[in-house]
From Swiss-Prot:
This is Large ribosomal subunit protein uL3. One of the primary rRNA binding proteins, it binds directly near the 3'-end of the 23S rRNA, where it nucleates assembly of the 50S subunit. GO terms for biological process: translation. It comes from the Bacteria.
Length: 219
């Protein structure tokens, strides 16, 4: 069955393994996870739990700022006996009977050695050219070349008379939802609500991440 938890990426560091190897790890803080809702096949068409992470500021009248919860979010969280949450996700393929609404989910859900998938929003790079954005090759940089970092041909002239959808062109790079699969949990620090994950995970420091059991590695 799937296990899952939400958290924030704190940054990277390194730890020593039992055999003395130096292991690069990403530190993920995962406290304040609360079950907001249980979904069942009879009512919702599928089984899942809805988990919320990190408290949001209470509803403020006449404020449209996203840092304040709205009334529906407050009412939804009130049913679970908790405050509105900033980061909410659902986890399917879980044993719903093991959870109750309002229950807290701790980092002890996972153990050292577990194989996990981590989902986050990649770092935004702004507007970039085709070479950086799509890893295309440069043209000749020598004297006389008219083609250095341009994207090249984007399609035929008279026959198609248009640029096809999906053509790799300059544009905004990053800021996409990315999942890195089959990462290893190196260490669990229950006292500080921290998970140490081997390697790097998507997103900037303080970015929200979603950790689930590996869809491939645990079969």
């Amino acid at each position: 069955m799937t296990k899952g938890i939400l958290g924030r990426k704190i940054g990277m560091t390194q730890v020593f393994g039992e055999n003395g190897d130096l292991i690069p790890v990403t530190v993920v803080e995962a406290s304040q996870n609360v079950i907001l809702q249980k979904k069942s096949e009879e009512i919702d068409g599928y089984n899942a739990i809805q988990v919320g992470y990190e408290d949001k500021q209470a509803y403020k009248k006449d404020s449209r700022s996203s840092k304040y919860a709205n009334k529906p979010a407050e009412g939804h969280a009130k049913k679970a006996g908790t405050a509105p949450k900033r980061f909410i996700r659902e986890f399917r393929n879980v044993n719903v009977d093991e959870y109750e609404v309002g229950q807290e989910v701790s980092v002890n859900t996972f153990e050292a050695g577990d194989v996990i998938d981590v989902t986050g929003v990649s770092k935004g790079k702004g507007f970039q050219g085709a070479i950086k954005r799509h890893n295309q090759a440069r043209g000749p940089m020598s004297h006389g070349s008219h083609f250095h970092r341009a994207p090249g041909s984007v399609g035929m002239a008279s026959d198609a008379s248009r640029v096809f959808k999906g053509q790799k062109m300059p544009g905004r790079m990053g800021g996409n939802t990315v999942t890195v699969q089959n990462l290893e949990v190196v260490q669990i620090d229950a006292e500080n609500n921290v998970i140490l994950v081997k390697g790097n995970v998507p997103g900037p420091k303080k970015g929200f991440v979603e950790i689930t059991s590996s869809i491939k590695g645990n079969k």
